[in-house]
Amino acid sequence: MVQMNDVKMVYGNTEAAALNGISFTINEGEFVFLVGPSGSGKTTIIKLITGELSPTSGQIAVNGFDMQGIKRRKLPKLRRTLGVIFQDFRLIDKMTVYENVAFAMRVVGASNKEIRRRVPQVLELVGLADREKRFPAELSGGEQQRVAIARALVNNPRMIIADEPTGHLDPVRSLELMLLLEKINELGTTVLVVTHEKELVDAFSKRVISIDAGRVISDGLDGYYGYEAE
């Protein structure tokens, strides 16, 4: 699924490494939290997994793709195996809930028949079947995040990457969101959650990879965050 072996990332002409010898493996079907203080390298790891960046050195494999020098023409195929959920939702204001989710299928060339079949299924899964005709401005923050999850999930990715998905949600909605991601994982999708939410991480017995200063400092199954909440 994801393999990083002694990965180093240096931006531009800077001497300090954003990542300095990162190694870990995320297997098919896992649910993993990636945690660490601000500036520790979490965002860089996401960009390397999605092909937005290439490593300075080391080896990375994602869903069978060798990310060291991956050809630009192969990036769309890689990214179809990934569903990314952003903290700021990134919904299209002029599109309804249904249209926002359907748009993710249209950009990869799905037929209208496929869209009509798949979109209602995903909206049902995330609990928004009765909101399909609403616009983003008519939804709560939690509902908007569920639309973002539906959009990330609609093309059947092998892996969901959630980048600070609870950043704009209250504690109750944050817990609901994590339970939804857990349900998606139980259905077979690998889930990687990048978060600062110590309470959420400690509440779920999942694997936690902790990084600091561009290095993995712990990797365990005890579900413990390991940092003071920021």
Label for each model-derived stretch:
Residues 1, 10-21, 71:
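A short, flexible loop at the N-terminus of ABC-type nucleotide-binding domains that lies
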Residues 58-66:
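Conserved ABC transporter NBD signature motif
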Residues 95-103:
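Short coil-to-helix segment of the ABC ATPase nucleotide-binding domain corresponding to the Q-loop/switch region
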Residues 154-158:
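A short, proline-enriched helix->beta-strand linker immediately N-terminal to the Walker B motif
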Residues 160-163:
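Catalytic Walker B motif of ABC-type/P-loop ATPase nucleotide-binding domains
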